[in-house]
From Swiss-Prot:
Intracellular or extracellular location(s): Cytoplasm
Gene Ontology cellular component annotations, sorted alphabetically: cytosol
Active-site residues per Swiss-Prot or TrEMBL entry: H20
Molecular functions per Gene Ontology: D-ribose pyranase activity; intramolecular lyase activity; intramolecular transferase activity; monosaccharide binding
Record EC number: 5.4.99.62
Role summary: Catalyzes the interconversion of beta-pyran and beta-furan forms of D-ribose.
PANTHER family noted in UniProt: D-RIBOSE PYRANASE
SUPFAM superfamilies: RbsD-like
Protein name per the record: D-ribose pyranase
Keywords, in A-Z order: Carbohydrate metabolism, Cytoplasm, Isomerase
Subunit structure: Homodecamer.
Residues that hold substrate according to the record: D28, H106, Y128, A129, N130
Pathway given in the UniProt record: Carbohydrate metabolism; D-ribose degradation; D-ribose 5-phosphate from beta-D-ribopyranose: step 1/2
Length: 139
């Protein structure tokens, strides 16, 4: 059995095969996922797993150089948005590299998911709790 934090085999494979600038979307239970993009559905029930739990695991297993979020996330769900911001700042401190944050409209965000290697669906039911991670390099 694997000892590290990430146990889900599909997600583990995805993280292990990321190249520089590849993108992963982590989304709430309601974001439409394009048929053309691989779906990794972790949702069990409302809130399980949470958006932040999933973000933390992905951050612990991969190097992220930038993120994209919808402008609406900060406006409509400021508490969870602030929690994501704190996680990103903590990751910057841990890895010693900046993580750029880009804000776009929710409609543009949905279109951008088409560029993701995969969309990871959580059980999160907070509006606009979605983020696109762009992979960095560890060196």
């Amino acid at each position: 059995m694997k000892k590290s934090t990430l146990l889900n085999s599909e997600l583990s494979y995805l993280v292990a095969t990321l190249g520089h600038t590849d993108e992963i979307t982590i989304c709430d239970a309601g974001l439409p996922i394009p048929d053309e993009v691989t779906r990794i559905d972790l949702a069990l029930t409302h809130g399980v797993p949470s958006f932040l739990e999933t973000v933390r695991v992905i951050l612990s297993e991969s190097q992220i150089e930038s993120v994209i979020v919808a402008q609406e996330f900060a406006q409509v769900s400021p508490v969870l948005h602030e929690a994501l911001y704190r996680e990103l700042k903590a990751e910057e401190q841990l890895c010693g590299k900046p993580i750029a944050i880009q804000y776009i409209s929710h409609e543009a965000f949905k279109q951008r998911t088409l560029q993701s290697r995969a969309v990871v669906r959580t059980g999160e039911c907070t509006p606009y709790a979605n983020v696109i991670f762009q992979a960095g390099v560890v060196f």
